[in-house]
């Protein structure tokens, strides 16, 4: 009989980051790491240094992302749109 093991490195708590999946013990969202990895081309090793995480935490976040890709891609699109709107508002205020 197979026993499925899970690694408890990803948590969701409504009191932390609105219940978005985070690396346990941090406020760092899984999507924050994914954006750095996919869009900014940061390697897993670079992410450990950038965010002071263990390699297992980084790979757990990436594994979680690929397991929940559709939902997290929606979150990422929403974050990108919000960032663009904030940037546009900031630029228009400065001019």
Predicted regions and their residues:
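Structural motif
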Residues: 23-25, 52-55
């Amino acid at each position: 009989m197979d026993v499925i093991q899970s690694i408890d490195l990803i948590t969701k708590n409504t009191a932390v980051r609105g219940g978005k999946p985070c690396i346990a013990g941090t406020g760092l969202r899984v999507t924050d790491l994914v954006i750095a990895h996919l869009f900014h081309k940061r390697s897993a090793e670079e992410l450990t240094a950038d965010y002071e995480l263990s390699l297992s935490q980084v790979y757990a976040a990436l594994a979680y992302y690929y397991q929940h890709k559709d939902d997290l891609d929606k979150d990422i699109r929403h974050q990108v749109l919000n960032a663009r709107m904030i940037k546009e508002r900031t630029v228009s205020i400065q001019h």
